[in-house]
Amino acid sequence: MGSILRIVQVGVLGVAVSSCAPTPLPLHTTMDPLKVRKTSLTATLVMPESLKNATPRKEVSCAGTFDVPIGVELETAMTQALSQVFESVDVVEEKRLATHSDVIIEMAIPDLQAEGHCTLRRTLYATGPLYFVFAMFDPSDTYEGRVDLSGTVTGSAGQQLLAGTFNSKTHTKSTITTDRLNRAFAVETVFRESLIDTIQQLIRTLVKSPEFHEYADRRNAKPVQP
């Protein structure tokens, strides 16, 4: 009998531990058209291994703990965005390898922040049988997320064309169910929209900057070397 109880205890503990395990959360980031003028310049995105493999663990209230492969998401999204501005985009692990590009882009690991709000739902659940009476008050969970993204853009001779930190607005997503997949999808959505927000800011700030326009004009006027 004791051995049976021990097996049950171990099984329950295993379920409890597995339920607390972080959930992998790919963001499936895709950049929409930015409606910017494409140049004839070439670009290289520097993605060191530490950035490419960056997978921060984020604990989000009311949702759980998530491992977000933000390095992979950043590379995908930045490549798509830069391809709308530059004739070609290469990706290298070290800046010294970017020897033939007009423009070099370096990024820091994005800072992800998110929190959930589920107090109303939990309060209504506590009412027991009266839950469905009070459900008319829309007991949805709301998740808020934002991203801060720092980056620098330099010319082929090292001249700075852009440097700064871009802060997304706070993006929100609500879900009326407590299903684990719905919670994860809500967190994925606010992270993805926030990352896209910051990349759009970076690209639009770059293409509007006088430094970039002047540099692009000089590179376009430079005679082609035989």
Feature roles, as predicted:
Residues 60-70, 134-148, 154-204:
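Short secondary-structure boundary motifs at beta->alpha junctions and helix caps
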